[in-house]
């Protein structure tokens, strides 16, 4: 399932999800969290999202989810690279952090293709993660 490598379980109801998305509003409004919709060029359907969290820091965090029927086509790589390139120029961070589930080989490849190296690890209730540091792509 698409939520297998998300850090949290999806809310069980629309009411529960309302609580979750409402907590996202303040960081979106103050510009510290940015979210980009990944759309198909042919028909503009939503393929996923890329998040840039702690965007105003020297090392913002990248995150991504791509719908299952669109995975395996390089869309995640293209989307993360596009956001990292834009942010490298527009926000001028030193680097990006990209936490990835240890078993999420496809997402690990995204980081590695962008010059990312493992700098740490994290544990959460669903899985263990490695944290990649991706350099500013404009330097």
Give the ranges of each region predicted by the language model:
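Conserved GNAT-fold acetyl-CoA-binding loop/helix
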Residues: 3-23, 34-36
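Acyl-donor (CoA/ACP) binding surface of acyl/acetyltransferases
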Residues: 1-5, 35-139
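Short loop/turn motifs at secondary-structure junctions and domain boundaries
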Residues: 26-32
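Short, P/G- and charge-enriched loop/turn segments at secondary-structure junctions
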Residues: 23-26, 119-120
């Amino acid at each position: 399932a698409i939520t297998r490598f998300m850090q949290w379980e999806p809310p069980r109801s629309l009411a529960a999800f309302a609580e979750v998305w409402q907590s996202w509003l303040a960081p979106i409004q103050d510009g510290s969290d940015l979210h980009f919709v990944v759309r198909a060029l042919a028909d503009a359907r939503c393929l996923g999202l890329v998040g840039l969290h702690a965007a105003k820091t020297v090392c913002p965090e990248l995150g991504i989810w791509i719908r299952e029927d669109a995975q395996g086509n390089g869309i995640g790589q293209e989307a993360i690279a596009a956001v990292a390139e834009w942010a490298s120029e527009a926000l001028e961070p030193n680097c990006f952090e990209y936490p990835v589930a240890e078993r999420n080989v496809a997402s690990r490849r995204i980081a590695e293709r962008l010059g990312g190296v493992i700098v740490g690890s994290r544990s959460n209730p669903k899985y263990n993660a490695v944290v990649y540091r991706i350099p500013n792509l404009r330097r």
